[in-house]
């Protein structure tokens, strides 16, 4: 059985971790959408609306890009059999190929994130989001520590990247434009990791 190969197990776990992490992120963003529409406190409504605005291009791009990568990896797991029509993987791959293109290509989504969302309210929205992620990493649950330590290390890299790209927006738009896709992907992976931290926080809780 191919499941006996460590590389196959790694591929399956990679697909599972991305899919379930994105699902958790989607649920969180849906919750923020509800809050932005119906919460009685106007300040909380606005904060949720800001988060939805910031994360919309991230979710659209990461979900469609990762959908492509995961479907391709699934085909690889099937081997040559996955390339044929028998298993349906090739159909999923072809169907998914349009998703990074329509509703604004993913490069357009990345440019929207960098040139509009990052500078909105003088960068206060992205700063608050990164601070929220950092605060959620400060859990007292020791079981979470290996995961939160890893996330905090990468969050520091993203914070430096954010400062760099904000500076480039002011002084070198070509450099900022060239880095748009990389920045969105970095923020996307941090967001998925943060969603997993929220899931693990509940899973590891002693009830």
Walk through the language-model features, giving the residues of each.
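Flavin-dependent oxidoreductase catalytic core characteristic
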Residues: 1-207
């Amino acid at each position: 059985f191919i499941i006996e190969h460590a590389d196959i197990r790694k591929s399956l776990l990679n697909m599972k971790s991305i899919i379930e992490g994105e699902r958790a992120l989607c649920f969180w963003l849906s919750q923020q959408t509800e809050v932005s529409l119906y919460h009685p406190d106007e300040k909380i409504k606005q904060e949720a609306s800001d988060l939805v605005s910031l994360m919309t291009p991230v979710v659209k791009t990461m979900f469609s890009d990762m959908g492509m990568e995961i479907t391709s990896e699934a085909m690889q797991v099937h081997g040559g059999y996955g390339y044929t029509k028998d298993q349906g993987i090739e159909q999923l791959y072809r169907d998914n190929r349009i998703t990074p293109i329509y509703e604004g290509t993913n490069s357009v989504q990345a440019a929207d994130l960098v040139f509009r969302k990052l500078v909105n309210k003088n960068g206060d929205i992205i700063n608050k989001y990164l601070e929220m992620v950092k605060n959620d990493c400060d859990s007292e649950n020791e079981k979470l520590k290996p995961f939160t330590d890893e996330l905090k290390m990468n969050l520091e890299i993203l914070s430096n990247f954010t400062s760099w790209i904000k500076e480039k927006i002011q002084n070198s738009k070509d450099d900022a434009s060239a880095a748009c896709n990389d920045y969105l992907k970095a923020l996307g992976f941090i967001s998925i990791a943060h969603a997993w931290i929220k899931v693990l926080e509940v899973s590891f809780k002693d009830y």
